[in-house]
Amino acid sequence: MSQIREKDIIKVQITGIQKYGAFANIDNNYDGLIHISEISYGYVKNINDYINIGDNIYAEVKNIDDNTKKIKLSIKDIDYKKMVKN
């Protein structure tokens, strides 16, 4: 997990959606969560209006917990479907 750092923009694949957020796979090695509050600044009634299972999108790494290996992601500050990583 050392190659992934907070504030990085990374490509992820959406693997699951719940009422509280979306689960994403990172490089087939790690899993992350995009909490519903990190999808848009506006009210999100249905996450599927923004992303769906199987979508390959870009997300910003907000937090990495090295102890639990949990990665918190966000898409609300980037163009998550068109962003190109530098």
Descriptions of predicted regions:
Residues 1-86:
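Single-stranded RNA-binding regions, centering on S1/OB-family and related RNA-binding modules
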